[in-house]
Amino acid sequence: MGTLSVNQNKLQKRLRRLAGEAITDFNMIEDGDKVMVCLSGGKDSYTMLDILLYLQKVAPIRFEIVAVNMDQKQPGFPEHVLPEYLKSIGVEYHIVEKDTYSVVKEKIPEGKTTCSLCSRLRRGTLYTFADEIGATKMALGHHRDDILETFFLNMFYGGTLKAMPPKLLADDGRNVVIRPLAYCSEKDIEAYSQLKEFPIIPCNLCGSQENLQRQVVKEMLLEWERKSPGRTEIMFRALQNVVPSQLADRNLFDFANLRIDENATPRFLDVMNL
């Protein structure tokens, strides 16, 4: 890649800045960490690795980066692409081989959504491998749009107000998951991926499925953004500005014991009868 144009340079700086802010805000990476960067071969994880490698050079702390890809034995998966790319940039890497593809195809009827089971199987395998190599953090490539889509999916279809946190302690208590791209937009990541000409590997399982609930929500959010530019940013800001007393979850706020404060200063209004 040659010299960047002004706009390309701004894009790169913006992504690096936003990733750095997210890492700082949530204390994602600490001195001495060994960060296992989960690389799928998609635009998001390539961008995450690229930015983390840059931040590793300029950060005031020292941390290791190990790239890990999970070969799920999907038919036609180009096994050579990631090793060749990672060797070319000099990054330590591991390829974890686990035939989750056959399990998913066996358990999920044809035409049904495979994403949930596929994700659980992949996550469990990666958690175990993180333990094996002594990784202290596991970095995933989810971005701002993913987080918002998950929020609306859970609200519309699950009846819960939850999304993807930028930093998460896994259920096993042994893995800390971080999402350095939490503040970055998918639009910027797509543009950066094209700029850097990453060797993208398509997903033959979920990537080709149509009419998924997530795709419906994605299109809804894109339409909102088209009609009201900036709405996505405002909605994401709302996830960082929660007011439990203005919702209805009794576990988050003690509504039952709300009482008049006898010591509160009375407020009197002058009323004019017309």
Swiss-Prot record:
It catalyses: cytidine(32) in tRNA + S-sulfanyl-L-cysteinyl-[cysteine desulfurase] + AH2 + ATP = 2-thiocytidine(32) in tRNA + L-cysteinyl-[cysteine desulfurase] + A + AMP + diphosphate + H(+). Keywords: 4Fe-4S, ATP-binding, Cytoplasm, Iron, Iron-sulfur, Magnesium, Metal-binding, Nucleotide-binding, RNA-binding, Transferase, tRNA processing, tRNA-binding. GO terms for molecular function: 4 iron, 4 sulfur cluster binding; ATP binding; magnesium ion binding; sulfurtransferase activity; tRNA binding. Pathway: tRNA modification. Pfam families: ATP_bind_3. [4Fe-4S] cluster binds at residues 115, 118, 206. Its cofactor is Mg(2+); [4Fe-4S] cluster. One of its GO terms (biological process) is tRNA thio-modification. GO terms for cellular component: cytosol. SUPFAM superfamilies: Adenine nucleotide alpha hydrolases-like. Binds 1 [4Fe-4S] cluster per subunit. The cluster is chelated by three Cys residues, the fourth Fe has a free coordination site that may bind a sulfur atom transferred from the persulfide of IscS. Its EC number is 2.8.1.-. The keyword Coiled coil does not apply. It is found in: Cytoplasm. It comes from the Bacteria. The thiolation reaction likely consists of two steps: a first activation step by ATP to form an adenylated intermediate of the target base of tRNA, and a second nucleophilic substitution step of the sulfur (S) atom supplied by the hydrosulfide attached to the Fe-S cluster. Catalyzes the ATP-dependent 2-thiolation of cytidine in position 32 of tRNA, to form 2-thiocytidine (s(2)C32). The sulfur atoms are provided by the cysteine/cysteine desulfurase (IscS) system. Belongs to the TtcA family. HAMAP family: TtcA. Homodimer. PANTHER family: AMINOTRAN_5 DOMAIN-CONTAINING PROTEIN, SULFURTRANSFERASE-RELATED. This is tRNA-cytidine(32) 2-sulfurtransferase. It comes from Pseudomonas aeruginosa (strain ATCC 15692 / DSM 22644 / CIP 104116 / JCM 14847 / LMG 12228 / 1C / PRS 101 / PAO1). The lineage of its organism: Bacteria, Pseudomonadati, Pseudomonadota, Gammaproteobacteria, Pseudomonadales.
